[in-house]
């Protein structure tokens, strides 16, 4: 009886635990089912996209690799340029990059200043349209006479009518050309010439003659500039957009 009692007592005492275990098991199953409902395979349209994840990782690694290679090439180019600069700058082996670049900038400024002061570059045409006239008197000791000359400079855009306009001015003023020099660079031109006025003598007002010559050359420059402006405006109208605009404008007016 004691054994029977103990057995029954054990079974009775363990009954709640058995029931409790079964409830926990059911609860765990329901929680797992809810977890599966939240992340079911149908929500992904099939199996979990492991291939897509692998492909994304490979793509990211490829982009990172290409970025590292591009950065390496950029550093190599910079280092090669710095090496070339070190060869041009004396005693630059111990200079860091910032000091090297500062030294190069200073040398470039010095070279630019020397080039601007060189007489070779002073005769080059400038961006501004200008006319200069400088009268000079040359004495001839043998004949005991003075000759008046004009050193003139004419700078403008390189236009075909510039020469003809200058020739017209010189012919009108009866000036003799002793020397002429034409320099054309980058669509600009400068004409330096030395002129002689055979009609001038010691009683001639040199300043008035120089002023008249400069005024005539300035008038010629204005004609050349206006002609250049008209030509450039005609060339601009030849663009496709403006041709379309003008044609549509005229068609509406008609």
Curated annotation (Swiss-Prot):
GO terms for molecular function: DNA binding; DNA-binding transcription factor activity; protein dimerization activity. Gene3D superfamilies: Helix-loop-helix DNA-binding domain (4.10.280.10). It comes from the Eukaryota. It is found in: Nucleus. Residues 62-111 form the bHLH domain. Expressed constitutively in roots, stems, and flowers. Keywords: DNA-binding, Nucleus, Transcription, Transcription regulation. Transmembrane segments: none annotated. GO terms for biological process: regulation of DNA-templated transcription. SMART domains: HLH. PROSITE patterns: BHLH (PS50888). Induction: Repressed by salicylic acid (SA) treatment. GO terms for cellular component: nucleus. InterPro entries: AIG1-like, bHLH_dom, HLH_DNA-bd_sf. Pfam families: HLH. Coiled coil: none annotated. PANTHER family: TRANSCRIPTION FACTOR BHLH30, TRANSCRIPTION FACTOR BHLH51. Homodimer. This is Transcription factor bHLH51. It comes from Arabidopsis thaliana. The gene is BHLH51.
């Amino acid at each position: 009886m004691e054994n029977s009692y103990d057995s029954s007592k054990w079974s009775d005492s363990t009954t709640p635990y058995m029931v409790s275990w079964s409830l926990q098991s059911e609860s765990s199953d329901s929680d797992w089912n809810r977890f599966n409902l939240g992340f079911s395979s149908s929500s992904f349209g099939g199996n979990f996209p492991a291939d897509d994840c692998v492909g994304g990782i490979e793509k990211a690694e490829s982009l990172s690799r290409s970025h590292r290679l591009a950065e390496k090439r950029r550093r190599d180019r910079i280092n090669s340029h710095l090496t070339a600069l070190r060869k041009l700058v004396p005693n630059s082996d111990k200079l860091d990059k910032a000091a090297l670049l500062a030294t190069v900038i200073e040398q470039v400024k010095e070279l630019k200043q020397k080039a601007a002061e060189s007489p070779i570059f002073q005769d080059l045409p400038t961006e501004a349209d200008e006319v200069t006239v400088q009268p000079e008197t040359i004495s001839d000791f043998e004949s005991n006479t003075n000759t008046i000359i004009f050193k003139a400079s004419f700078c403008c855009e390189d236009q075909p009518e510039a020469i003809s306009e200058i020739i017209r001015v010189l012919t009108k003023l009866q000036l003799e050309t002793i020397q002429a020099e034409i320099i054309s660079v980058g669509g600009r031109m400068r004409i330096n010439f030395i002129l002689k006025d055979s009609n001038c003598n010691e009683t001639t007002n040199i300043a008035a003659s120089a002023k008249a010559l400069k005024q005539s050359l300035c008038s010629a420059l204005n004609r050349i500039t206006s002609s250049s402006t008209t030509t450039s405006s005609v060339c601009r109208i030849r663009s496709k957009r403006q041709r379309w605009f003008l044609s549509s404008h005229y068609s509406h007016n008609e």
